UniProtKB/Swiss-Prot annotation:
SMART domains xref list: Solute_trans_a (SM01417)
Record bears the keyword Ligase: no
tRNA-binding in keyword set: no
Segments for region (Disordered): 375-425
Bilayer topology: Multi-pass membrane protein
Protein name: Transmembrane protein 184A
Keywords: Cell membrane, Cytoplasm, Cytoplasmic vesicle, Endosome, Membrane, Transmembrane, Transmembrane helix
Family listed: Belongs to the TMEM184 family.
PANTHER family cross-referenced by the UniProt entry: ORGANIC SOLUTE TRANSPORTER-RELATED
Cell compartments where the protein resides: Cell membrane; Cytoplasm, Perinuclear region; Cytoplasmic vesicle membrane; Early endosome membrane
GO biological process assignments: germ-line sex determination; regulation of protein localization; regulation of secretion
Function: Acts as a heparin receptor in vascular cells. May be involved in vesicle transport in exocrine cells and Sertoli cells.
């Protein structure tokens, strides 16, 4: 080969350029545009199978589940507002039903905006704040079913608390039910309504200063501390809800609370624990640390949150079906068609306005956290039971004047609940 090259040099330059240059690799290398193009192709080929969340299939499938759940739940909310005959119950029922639209739509928007900027933090904050609202609303709905604190205390006051490791009452051995127990249940759920919005605001602030990254358990990252506070707060709230159900499950039996209780706890617990599982998988390296989405680098924590949002989009359809059976509107429709309606019908707009107003939560928080907490009285207005109510106790409504029924006003049986003795406080 060396002899051939020497011969070509002596024979003349044109022959060298004609025969030697084509097979040599150096002239093919200096193409400037080839480098970046190949890099993009490689990134796309490597990232495409891993980034299912940004594909049209993932967004389409999640969208179908979300909009189906929205239609089903929207129709159920409308049915309750059309038969808004028990405001003090249905107000909380509708609040519970709104968990599906808020969870589903927020998760879908977070999935659509998955990328380098963690927009999902803002949507998840709204979703998580409503989670606290749901826990409180369910507990208060159970209070309304039973007629309030005074009516509950009339049934359980002085009874010993059964020790059970399954129900988490093993540490309450030798204690009996008192108003302090009910107050603890209320305070434990109300504290979550306060802690969660505060932690959501802190998360947004830390995110703005680049001090918050999902899945980053470093002591210098805000994620660790936000997660610890959130887990402690939600665990306390759910524990209080569980204790209340354990104490009143016999009283709540006519209202079929098991499906209601399991559905609400499944929605909250499932999203909570699957989020924790994804964070652990991300920490263990199962979820890759960095992916590329359209040239944008996405952290593993953001990717784990994307999987969480996709799962929630799918799960909300099944949640909407479960809530449809747990809180049917037919019970109140029968009451509407009875000869003696329990309360004057309200318009859909006024019923919706009453439902979304947080005024009752603020008042309840002030009352239960006040140092001057005293005997709690509650006046319940019970309607004369009409046909088609299935033997259930009539729900309580706002107390009306005790002047009887006259001038076209419907008859009401106003029962003043007894004062809870001060020694129970």
């Amino acid at each position: 080969m060396r002899n051939a090259s020497g011969f070509l040099k002596t024979a003349g330059a044109p022959l060298v350029s004609a025969t030697w240059l084509p097979p040599s690799p150096p002239p093919a290398m200096p193409t400037v545009a080839a480098g970046p193009q190949m890099e993009r192709v490689d990134n796309g080929s490597q990232g495409a199978p891993q980034l299912f969340l940004t594909s049209a299939l993932a967004r389409g499938v999640s969208g179908v589940f979300v909009w189906t759940a929205l239609l089903l739940t929207g129709h159920q909310i409308y049915s309750h507002l059309r038969s808004y005959t028990a405001p003090r119950e249905q107000r909380f029922v509708i609040r519970l039903l709104f968990i599906v639209p808020i969870y589903a739509f927020d998760s879908w928007l977070s999935l659509l905006l998955l990328g380098g900027h963690p927009y999902y933090v803002y949507f998840d904050s709204v979703r998580d704040c409503y989670e606290a609202f749901v826990i409180y609303s369910f507990l208060t709905l159970c209070f309304q079913y039973l007629g309030g604190e005074s009516a509950i205390m009339a049934e359980i006051r002085g009874k010993p608390i059964r020790s059970s490791c399954f129900y988490g009452t093993c540490c309450l051995r030798g204690m009996s039910y008192s108003i302090t127990f009910l107050r603890f249940c209320k305070q434990a759920t109300l504290q979550f309504c306060i802690v969660k919005p505060v932690m959501a605001l802190i998360t947004i602030i830390l995110q703005a200063f680049d001090k918050y990254h999902d899945g980053d358990f470093n002591i210098h990252s805000g994620y660790l501390y936000v997660t610890l506070v959130y887990n402690a707060s939600v665990s306390l709230a759910l524990y209080a809800l569980f204790l209340f159900y354990f104490a009143t499950r016999d009283l709540l039996r006519p209202f079929e609370p098991v499906l209601k209780f399991l559905t609400i706890k499944a929605i909250i617990f499932l999203s909570f624990w699957q989020g924790m599982l994804l964070a652990i998988l991300e920490r263990c390296g199962v979820i890759p640390e960095v992916q590329a989405v359209d040239g944008t680098r996405v952290g593993a924590g953001t990717l784990a949150a994307g999987y969480q949002n996709f799962l929630i989009c799918v799960e909300m359809l099944f949640a909407s079906l479960a809530l449809r059976y747990a809180f049917p509107s037919q019970v109140y429709s029968e009451k509407k068609n009875s000869p003696v309606p329990p309360a004057p019908m309200q318009s859909i707009s006024s019923g919706l306005k009453e439902t979304i107003s947080p005024q009752d939560i603020v008042q309840d928080a002030i009352h239960n956290f006040s140092p001057a907490y005293q005997q709690y009285t509650q006046q319940s207005t019970h309607e004369a039971p009409g046909p088609g109510q299935g033997g259930h106790p009539a729900p309580s409504t706002h107390p009306g004047p005790a002047s009887g029924s006259g001038g076209g006003k419907k008859s009401r049986n106003i029962e003043k609940r007894m004062l809870i003795p001060s020694e129970d406080l």
